[in-house]
Amino acid sequence: MENLFIFLFALLLFCFMLLKLSKKYSALKLPPGPRPLPIIGNLHQIGGGLMHHILREMARTYGPLFRIKFGQVSTIVVSSPEIAKEIFRTHDVVFSYRPQNIAVFNVMTYNFSNIAFAPYGNYWRQMRKICVMEILGASRVRSFGSIRQEEVMNLIRFVGSHKGKLVNVSEKIYGLTYSITARAAFGKVSKYQQVFKEHMDKYDDLARGLDIADFYPSMKFLRLVTGMERKLKVMFKEVDEILQVIIDEHRDQRMKKIRSKVDDNEKEEEEGNEDIVDVLMNLQQSGQTELPVTDDNIKAVILDIFGAGGDTTAATLEWALAESLKNKQVLKRAQEELRTIFHSKRNVDESGFNQLKYLPAIVKETLRLHPPAPLSLPRECSEECNIYGYDIPAKTRVMVNIWAMGRDPKYWSEPEEFKPERFIDSRIDYKGNDFEYIPFGAGRRICPGMSFAIPNVALPLAQLLFHFDWKVDDDAGKLEDLDMVEHPVLEARRKNELKLIPVIYEGSCLKN
């Protein structure tokens, strides 16, 4: 009898709280949106297609700001530059928070001590400043130039050695961006580099899968049912062990240098060639940061670097090459520019990049049509606010459809066409001030890795277009027939790999 009374009391209390919450929301002017079903919300409406495509279609029905429910999670979707500006500039502080109950980020961020998902506050400000000023600043990115050049030339030589044969260019591109990132992070080629890549590939495969438990934060038992968190923890343990070994090796090397009393000139030379782990360990040991930098903080930032500099960069490079090859006039103009400017060198290097106009426009146009993340990483409203005349309750998540805004005919002529010339002599840039074009996001949470990513796209693209003319296999038709189908993953890579036949250009240094 007592148990029955407790049960009835709990049920009445639950109903009372539900009624109170319902009355509170009914008093608000909420954004429009599709009617959610009990329990599942609108989950049934997002299956069977690419999320950013589905959300664009919904925006055509419900407007540039609409509300949708993923299970228990209320989310607003933004598809307009004007509203994105309200989110990222007017109310930037309110929307600078990240949701803290997504399985993949719970596990793989060292208790949210990375930059992408750290809670907005002193720690996040410190780590972002370190990232922008110390790790991925202009001078540091330039210092990685020799790594880029060497790794890209390795790729070019490999492709050249397979002239006339079918090459899986996509596979080589993904290997290239990983190698550049790994050497920038760890220094010389590490004996753990390949096994680390294998683990990161497995992690990426897991991270791309939706965990239904993320949509029901109050139902903790679902974590056990889906098993996603358990799998992630196993993977995380393996990745963590490799990263700790790499940090310990760096620490041992530093101690050896101290004991050997390296002279000042030698120190200066080495400091110019520091890798990212070195930079973070310098800050760790200096004691000059407001908050201590732990080994776990270093590992979290390294995983961030791989997230920004690995697959997303490779996907952009892959799209840029595919779009250039598919569009005959774009290919002709790009190759003419490159082969004129670098004719005497018979090779491309970054010292001549300031003379290029069309190649940077190709990169910008690729980012418009194929942004690295078609939907912005989720943010969370820290307090109730008003956006576009609608009330947004606290804890509401927000996603910005960056992909849709880059294809909006209101802001772009012939938005579905690949036209790099639209960016020549244009002041529109990807640095977060032009809200119709924010491939790296905007506001306080803008991606700090853009300065690292852009050269890692531009140099290999330039080399691949300079050194080779390209053909497809006879069964695949012509270059103009290349498909542009997206893979349904977060970074929107190509669904089908680029498999091409290289023909070495007569003016290339590869031609003996």
Swiss-Prot record:
Glycans are attached at N111, N168. Gene3D superfamilies: Cytochrome P450 (1.10.630.10). SUPFAM superfamilies: Cytochrome P450 (SSF48264). Residues 1-24 form the signal peptide. GO terms for molecular function: heme binding; iron ion binding; monooxygenase activity; oxidoreductase activity, acting on paired donors, with incorporation or reduction of molecular oxygen. InterPro entries: Cyt_P450, Cyt_P450_CS, Cyt_P450_E_grp-I, Cyt_P450_sf. Keywords: Glycoprotein, Heme, Iron, Metal-binding, Monooxygenase, Oxidoreductase, Signal. Belongs to the cytochrome P450 family. PANTHER family: CYTOCHROME P450 71D11-LIKE, CYTOCHROME P450 FAMILY 71 PROTEIN. This is Cytochrome P450 71BT1. It comes from Catharanthus roseus (Madagascar periwinkle). The lineage of its organism: Eukaryota, Viridiplantae, Streptophyta, Embryophyta, Tracheophyta. The gene is CYP71BT1.
